[in-house]
Amino acid sequence: MAKKIQAYIKLQVKAGQANPSPPVGPALGQHGVNIMEFCKAFNARTQGQEPGLPTPVIITVYSDRSFTFETKSTPAAVLLKKAAGITSGSARPNTQKVGTVTRAQLEEIAKAKQADLTAAEMEAAVRTIAGSARSMGLNVEGV
């Protein structure tokens, strides 16, 4: 018989830097999950990623206090800010542009995000990422 699911927990944790402090500790502690076990497993799984990049994770907690988790790719906004060399998007994206991204940068981000995007083709994924860039106040070259 399958284990009964008690909760789903969605968090964004920096790759390779999970520790028991907030937000990880309180979110897992209230469900009775072994926090250090999660931190060690998460850090091991995100070891190949660039340290410090926020990584979305969905933790499934079962009624016997065991858990499984699934990591997603880094949010597109974070990758776009890194590619454009800015710290935050524009407060007025339609009138005030804060940076520029090229087609090559968009393709690189789309490749990294393709598993999490619903786009069937690479061109559609690039257009999706370009739309995110425009909504952040970035100029998009070549699309």
Swiss-Prot record:
Supply the alphabetized keyword list: Methylation, Ribonucleoprotein, Ribosomal protein, RNA-binding, rRNA-binding
Annotated InterPro entries? Ribosomal_uL11 (IPR000911), Ribosomal_uL11_bac-typ (IPR006519), Ribosomal_uL11_C (IPR020783), Ribosomal_uL11_C_sf (IPR036769), Ribosomal_uL11_CS (IPR020785), Ribosomal_uL11_N (IPR020784), Ribosomal_uL11_N_sf (IPR036796)
What's one GO-annotated cellular component?
A: cytosolic large ribosomal subunit
**Organism's domain of life?**
Bacteria
Protein's UniProt keywords contain RNA-binding:
yes
Q: What Pfam family is a match, any one?
A: Ribosomal_L11
Q: Which GO terms describe its molecular function?
A: large ribosomal subunit rRNA binding; structural constituent of ribosome
Which GO biological process annotations does it have? translation
Q: Does the keyword Ribonucleoprotein apply?
A: yes
Q: Mind telling me how this protein is modified after translation? A: One or more lysine residues are methylated.
Q: How does it assemble?
A: Part of the ribosomal stalk of the 50S ribosomal subunit. Interacts with L10 and the large rRNA to form the base of the stalk. L10 forms an elongated spine to which L12 dimers bind in a sequential fashion forming a multimeric L10(L12)X complex.
This molecule's function is given as: Forms part of the ribosomal stalk which helps the ribosome interact with GTP-bound translation factors.
User: Which PANTHER family does the record match to this protein?
Assistant: 60S RIBOSOMAL PROTEIN L12 (PTHR11661), LARGE RIBOSOMAL SUBUNIT PROTEIN UL11M (PTHR11661:SF1)
Family of this protein: Belongs to the universal ribosomal protein uL11 family.
Which NCBIfam families does UniProt cross-reference here? L11_bact
Protein name in the entry:
Large ribosomal subunit protein uL11
Write down the species. Answer: Stutzerimonas stutzeri (strain A1501) (Pseudomonas stutzeri)
